């Protein structure tokens, strides 16, 4: 009896099947797609499938991102305007410090004063999405040069920067909200989008306690930061 109990306590249960089948061949990919469509794959399995896809397509995703980045730097009125205004403040944003990379976290991009701008190539849906993302991060770069933003310790600074970037980049215009995020409201949709995205960004910062704290900080700076459209005369798009 003691032996049986000991043997049972040392045994391990088999890993739970999440529905994902490892493999990069076409047949396995099709099987995984079918499992996802028919509900035979858990959320964990879907995430594994997504990560495997991103790794598999990394080279192509980054090349497409770089080509679209270079096109936007040359031909996009919005991106060129922001680039010129950053240069007037003594900064320089170009293809040499805008990096296309595969990101592990579900985010579109990021700005670091010492590094530059990172675009998450595996999250870009199309060139329009990349333009919105690049504009968002370039507005952060502009704010860093003009207002000396304390990104690490001052949540009010971070909240204001996120409000301005979401407000001015074009990512909250109605068409983008409707087709990409399933937001159907007409009235006040722009303000609600800006507020929602600012709260999510502030909430992700280490100094923020929770969603309530993030909401409070965003509300404290909302009026002045939402009205501030520099370097534009008004909301561009």
Curated annotation (Swiss-Prot):
Cysteines paired by S-S bonds: none
Compositional bias ranges of the Polar residues kind: 1-15
Spans through the membrane: none
PROSITE patterns linked to this entry: ZINC_PROTEASE (PS00142)
One of the protein's GO biological processes: mitochondrial protein processing
Its biological purpose: Has a dual role in the assembly of mitochondrial ATPase. Acts as a protease that removes N-terminal residues of mitochondrial ATPase CF(0) subunit 6 at the intermembrane space side. Also involved in the correct assembly of the membrane-embedded ATPase CF(0) particle, probably mediating association of subunit 6 with the subunit 9 ring.
Protein name: Mitochondrial inner membrane protease ATP23
Species this protein is from: Coccidioides immitis (strain RS) (Valley fever fungus)
Taxonomic lineage from the root: Eukaryota, Fungi, Dikarya, Ascomycota, Pezizomycotina
Underlying gene: ATP23
